[in-house]
Design a protein with these regions (language model features):
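Flexible "arm" and connector segments at domain edges
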Residues: 1-88
């Protein structure tokens, strides 16, 4: 995701309260779950976008940086890969 898009997401986040963004994120997660349950690929893609946007906004409201998320993603991937190798 490029900086221009992140800046737009963050600018919108700054308008709303933390509680509002938390609530919106939960709503979007429910919509994503519904899209997955119905195997509606186009709707699922749209809902993925909504979830990603609102999650980035929640990170901002919590004063967490996206690079902190990157570190957690790396950790989780490493852990999963180690687990998979140990099952071979």
């Amino acid at each position: 995701m490029n900086k221009k898009v992140l800046d737009r997401i963050n600018a919108i986040a700054d308008i709303y309260t933390t509680s509002n963004r938390e609530q919106k994120a939960m709503e979007e997660l429910i919509e994503l779950l519904n899209g997955l349950a119905h195997r509606d690929k186009l709707n699922t893609l749209e809902e993925f976008a909504d979830v990603i946007i609102t999650m980035i906004q929640v990170l901002r409201k919590y004063d967490l940086r996206i690079d902190s998320l990157d570190r957690w993603i790396e950790y989780k991937l490493d852990r999963t890969e180690k687990r998979l190798k140990s099952n071979d």
